[in-house]
Each structure stands twice: as C-alpha cells, then as structure tokens.
C-alpha cells in the first residue's frame, strides 16, 4: 500500500527492523542493519567480523530472514541490470553510467527509489553518493550508531534522497537513490532510504518482521529539535 500522493512534512519515523520499502517486483527492501544489529553490508565488505549470528548476503545484495522471506540490504544491480556492454556479471563498474537509473521501488511514504545514477541540476548524469561516513574507529559492527551524517559530503540528505528532475518528472521532485559509495568513495551507507521524507502508510509498518517504532535518533542531528528525524 503506497500513498497516491506523498505528503511532505518534516522527516518521519521508520521501522528499526523489517521492510522499509518494496521493489517494483514486490521484494522487500530492509534498512542497513541485520538481525544482530550490525551493518550487513559493512560485514559483507569485510569491515568487521560478525560473532553474534551468521550473516551472508548473496550476489544480489539480499538474503532470507526469519520465515524465509527474501529481502535486499543493498542494491547489487540485479533488479535493474543495464550495462554499457553485453556483460551480465552484475558488477557496478559495468552499469551504464551515462543514463539515469530506473525506479527500483517505492518507500512506504510513496516516494520513488531510483538506482545510483541520477541527474544533477543541469540534467547531467552522475553517481549519487551518500553523505554518511563511519565514526572514527567504527566498523559497522554497531549498525546505524557507527555512522554520522556530514552535510555536503555527498549528494543526498539524511534520508538518502534529494530534489531534482527525473525521467518521470521534469519538475524537480523529491526521490531517493540507492547508494554504492559515499562522497569520499567509501561504501555508501545507508544504501537505501534511511528515514521517510513524507508520512508513510502505517499499514506497511511491521510487514516482513518490522518492529515499528523505537528507532535511533537521527544521526548527526540533535534530539532536542522540535521535529526529529528517525532512522530505520
């Protein structure tokens, strides 16, 4: 269930665990944390050793959780493969970098999630990069709390989105991107949206094992603000 018209507001709460969005093919998109609470992608990249529970992401950036439901933690290009060549190795280096990425799915607030390539304000295609980086000495073992948002580090805001034109709207519109890298070319935490830009449909919260509220306060922003952002 996706709102037909996303309602703009200050950033909204999102589930700590479970589905935060769905792909256009109906597969759940989860936040960056795995069951034990670490960054599943950082573990896959070898940044830390997971000693709490066996975790492994397949070639497409996903795996099965409790109950056997397959879900994605990052965009490994399987859902939108469009290479510059005839290659089918699903390597990011071979993704067509001269065209805007397609829509991968929709967050529960109704906004679209595009792949990693988008338009800047001059309609030039570029890789959209996140604005998060690891806190000094952190590895991702602590999940979301190991990261800090640095405004201007990359192209995207705290929720991993921005306002520009897209192939579906010449008028600039808010949308999310999947991210492979951050602004200094390290791994692209949070990989998919980290919070909601608009009011999500509450009927979606709790699907596929989500726990609803109780998420962390927004990274890099004071919790004393009157309008708080909250991560998955």
Question: Residue ranges of each PLM-predicted region?
Answer:
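Solvent-exposed N-terminal domain segments of exported/luminal and surface proteins
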Residues: 1-51
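Extended, compositionally biased non-globular segments
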Residues: 99, 106-211, 217
């Amino acid at each position: 269930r996706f709102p037909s018209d996303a309602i703009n507001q200050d950033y909204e709460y999102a589930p700590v665990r479970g589905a935060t969005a769905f792909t256009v093919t109906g597969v759940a998109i989860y936040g960056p944390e795995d069951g034990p609470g670490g960054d599943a992608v950082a573990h896959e990249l070898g940044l830390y050793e997971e000693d709490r529970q066996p975790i492994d992401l397949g070639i497409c950036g996903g795996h099965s959780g409790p109950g056997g439901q397959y879900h994605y933690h990052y965009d490994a290009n399987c859902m939108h493969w469009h290479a510059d060549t005839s290659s089918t190795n699903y390597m990011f280096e071979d993704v067509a970098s001269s065209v805007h990425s397609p829509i991968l799915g929709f967050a529960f607030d109704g906004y679209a999630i595009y792949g990693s390539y988008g338009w800047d304000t001059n309609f030039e295609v570029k890789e959209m990069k996140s604005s998060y980086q690891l806190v000094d000495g952190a590895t991702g073992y602590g999940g979301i709390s190991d990261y800090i948002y640095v405004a201007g580090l990359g192209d995207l805001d705290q929720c991993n989105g921005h306002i520009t034109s897209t192939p579906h709207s010449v008028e600039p519109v808010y949308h999310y991107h999947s991210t492979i890298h951050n602004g200094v070319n390290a791994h692209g935490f949070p990989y998919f949206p980290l919070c909601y830009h608009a009011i999500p449909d509450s009927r979606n919260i709790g699907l596929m094992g989500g726990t609803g509220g109780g998420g962390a306060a927004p990274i890099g922003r004071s919790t004393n603000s009157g309008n708080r952002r909250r991560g998955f």
